[in-house]
């Protein structure tokens, strides 16, 4: 009977876990994974135990890479995979459990600083780039040789940007090359002036110049991807780039270009809709999407204070990687806010999979902080550290007696007038939400209780005295997929 709706119960016990196999030939492992640089990193530190972190798509090469590194360094290598959160973040907790003295991160990385001090080396990969095709595509997209343009790329193509700029500089006068914001070695020389760090990249701007003056040419992506909105790195750039500047992308294999202006407008419209949903929300779920990135506890406290100031109830949920099945267990929550790294916040979310919107911390800030600039003037910040005190983008909450809290606000989704929030500090004895009524009754104002009262099913009821007393009988045996009394039909 169970085969009609699902696979037999024995299939889970007989299933064999497949292996991804060796994806890269042995002759190319040294070049693709920069083994010579990794060996120098391990020898300079004198580490005896090193953790090697691989994403799922590169686990097929993990065994061969670890064997080559052990042979070259004499150190013990530990392979880390299946991270609790995003694979782009450094798995500091996994490295500590293995007793590793250093960590080497392979594959795409958000380059967020870890929460605990640990020597880390990043190997972003070296994807082949058709320089001649990309140069022709750049010339077709940028006919004006005097227009300022910055070269961007996905992390695995960053090694080819300087060579591409060499082909273009004889004609283009104002060309800027970005580079990944890798951590600088201890004791290294800091250039003066220091380059601007944004979007996980460094921009060597000349004195008096700003990044908002430049257009962008992005090298990365693949034509095999049917939905380009699933690239979190490119989405981060499109959301944070100046709206009035041109932005185009180029496939490194074929040189095919695409104007990203329409896609950028669609992403911004989606984010503005999420901000409106957050303003209408009464209950906010704060998802702990990382435990290994620096200042995540401070950011969590900041978001809780933000929701309290806006008159909303917040709950902190630690669920690992968020999935629709996990979040469906909390129907009382109106919106969720994912506190994660920039790439984790913009991770692929198939349309319609989550029954409640999942927001970024920046969108909750725009919804709850009345001092935040209006849309079009405020930058879209993809890293939660940009919202904290000490950042140039930090906007403090206005005082409780500020007129900004009493400004009329109308929902663009429902058309209703939103009431101003009731600000009460956490140490106020009158913040227990118990309000005396003229009829000498007490009413408790709770969004969760209001939601429970509106539900048709409120859980199992004891029904004391309403059912006859009977003896205990034997219940059904088996599992839900196949009980013993259902037979084999």
UniProtKB/Swiss-Prot annotation:
<keyword id="KW-0408">Iron</keyword>
<feature type="binding site">
    <location>
        <position position="341"/>
    </location>
    <ligand>
        <name>[4Fe-4S] cluster</name>
    </ligand>
</feature>
<dbReference type="InterPro" id="IPR042265">
    <property type="entry name" value="DPH1/DPH2_3"/>
</dbReference>
<protein>
    <recommendedName>
        <fullName>2-(3-amino-3-carboxypropyl)histidine synthase subunit 2</fullName>
    </recommendedName>
</protein>
<dbReference type="InterPro" id="IPR010014">
    <property type="entry name" value="DHP2"/>
</dbReference>
<dbReference type="GO" id="GO:0120513">
    <property type="term" value="C:2-(3-amino-3-carboxypropyl)histidine synthase complex"/>
</dbReference>
<dbReference type="InterPro" id="IPR016435">
    <property type="entry name" value="DPH1/DPH2"/>
</dbReference>
<keyword id="KW-0007">Acetylation</keyword>
<feature type="modified residue" description="Phosphothreonine">
    <location>
        <position position="435"/>
    </location>
</feature>
<keyword id="KW-0411">Iron-sulfur</keyword>
<keyword id="KW-0479">Metal-binding</keyword>
<feature type="binding site">
    <location>
        <position position="110"/>
    </location>
    <ligand>
        <name>[4Fe-4S] cluster</name>
    </ligand>
</feature>
<comment type="function">
    <text>Required for the first step of diphthamide biosynthesis, a post-translational modification of histidine which occurs in elongation factor 2. DPH1 and DPH2 transfer a 3-amino-3-carboxypropyl (ACP) group from S-adenosyl-L-methionine (SAM) to a histidine residue, the reaction is assisted by a reduction system comprising DPH3 and a NADH-dependent reductase. Facilitates the reduction of the catalytic iron-sulfur cluster found in the DPH1 subunit.</text>
</comment>
<feature type="modified residue" description="N-acetylmethionine">
    <location>
        <position position="1"/>
    </location>
</feature>
<feature type="modified residue" description="Phosphoserine">
    <location>
        <position position="7"/>
    </location>
</feature>
<keyword id="KW-0597">Phosphoprotein</keyword>
<dbReference type="Pfam" id="PF01866">
    <property type="entry name" value="Diphthamide_syn"/>
</dbReference>
<dbReference type="InterPro" id="IPR042263">
    <property type="entry name" value="DPH1/DPH2_1"/>
</dbReference>
<comment type="similarity">
    <text>Belongs to the DPH1/DPH2 family. DPH2 subfamily.</text>
</comment>
<feature type="binding site">
    <location>
        <position position="89"/>
    </location>
    <ligand>
        <name>[4Fe-4S] cluster</name>
    </ligand>
</feature>
<feature type="modified residue" description="Phosphoserine">
    <location>
        <position position="446"/>
    </location>
</feature>
<comment type="pathway">
    <text>Protein modification; peptidyl-diphthamide biosynthesis.</text>
</comment>
<dbReference type="GO" id="GO:0017183">
    <property type="term" value="P:protein histidyl modification to diphthamide"/>
</dbReference>
<feature type="modified residue" description="Phosphothreonine">
    <location>
        <position position="467"/>
    </location>
</feature>
<feature type="modified residue" description="Phosphoserine">
    <location>
        <position position="456"/>
    </location>
</feature>
<dbReference type="GO" id="GO:0090560">
    <property type="term" value="F:2-(3-amino-3-carboxypropyl)histidine synthase activity"/>
</dbReference>
<comment type="subunit">
    <text>Component of the 2-(3-amino-3-carboxypropyl)histidine synthase complex composed of DPH1, DPH2, DPH3 and a NADH-dependent reductase. Interacts with DPH1.</text>
</comment>
<dbReference type="GO" id="GO:0051539">
    <property type="term" value="F:4 iron, 4 sulfur cluster binding"/>
</dbReference>
<dbReference type="GO" id="GO:0046872">
    <property type="term" value="F:metal ion binding"/>
</dbReference>
């Amino acid at each position: 009977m169970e085969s009609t709706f699902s696979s037999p119960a024995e299939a889970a016990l007989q299933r064999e876990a497949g292996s991804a196999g060796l994806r890269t030939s042995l002759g190319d492992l040294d070049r693709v994974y920069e083994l010579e640089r990794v060996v120098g990193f391990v020898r300079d530190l004198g580490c005896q135990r090193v953790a090697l972190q691989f994403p799922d798509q590169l686990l097929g090469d993990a065994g061969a890479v670890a064997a080559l590194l052990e042979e070259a360094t004499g150190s013990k290598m530990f392979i880390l995979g299946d991270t609790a959160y995003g694979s782009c973040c450094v798995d500091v907790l996994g490295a500590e459990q293995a007793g590793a003295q250093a960590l080497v991160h392979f594959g795409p990385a958000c380059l967020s600083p870890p929460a605990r001090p640990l020597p880390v080396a990043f190997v972003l990969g070296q994807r082949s780039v058709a320089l001649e095709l990309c140069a022709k595509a750049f010339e077709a997209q940028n006919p004006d040789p005097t227009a300022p343009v910055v070269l961007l790329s996905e992390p695995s193509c960053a090694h080819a940007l300087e060579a591409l700029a060499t082909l273009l500089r004889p004609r283009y006068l104002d060309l800027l090359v970005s580079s990944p914001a890798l951590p600088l070695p201890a004791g290294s020389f800091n250039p003066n002036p220091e380059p601007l760090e944004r979007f996980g990249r460094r921009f060597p701007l000349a004195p008096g110049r700003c990044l908002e003056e430049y257009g962008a040419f992005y090298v990365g992506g693949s034509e095999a991807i049917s939905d380009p909105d699933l690239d979190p790195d490119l989405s981060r750039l499109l959301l944070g780039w100046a709206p009035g500047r041109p932005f185009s992308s180029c496939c490194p294999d074929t040189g095919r270009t695409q104007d990203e202006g329409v896609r950028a407008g669609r992403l911004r419209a989606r984010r503005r809709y999420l901000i409106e949903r957050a303003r209408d929300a009464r209950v906010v779920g704060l998802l702990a999407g990382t435990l290994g990135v620096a200042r995540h506890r401070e950011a969590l406290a900041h978001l809780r204070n933000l929701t309290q100031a806006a008159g909303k109830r917040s709950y902190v949920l630690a669920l690992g990687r968020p999935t629709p099945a996990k979040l469906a267990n909390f129907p009382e929550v109106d919106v969720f806010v994912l506190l994660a790294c920039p790439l984790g916040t913009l991770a692929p979310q198939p349309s319609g999979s989550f029954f409640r919107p999942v927001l970024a911390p920046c969108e909750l800030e725009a919804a709850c902080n009345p001092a935040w600039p209006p849309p079009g003037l405020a930058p879209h910040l993809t890293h939660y550290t940009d919202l904290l005190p000490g950042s140039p983008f930090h906007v403090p909450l206005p005082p409780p007696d500020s007129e900004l809290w009493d400004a009329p606000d109308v929902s663009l989704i429902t058309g209703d007038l939103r009431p101003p929030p009731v600000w009460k500090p956490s140490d106020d004895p009158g913040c227990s939400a118990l309000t005396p009524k003229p009829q000498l009754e007490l009413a408790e104002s709770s969004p969760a209780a209001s939601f429970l009262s509106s539900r048709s099913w409120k859980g199992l009821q004891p029904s004391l005295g309403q059912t006859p007393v009977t003896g205990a009988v034997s219940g059904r045996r088996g599992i839900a997929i196949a009980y013993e009394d259902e037979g084999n039909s």
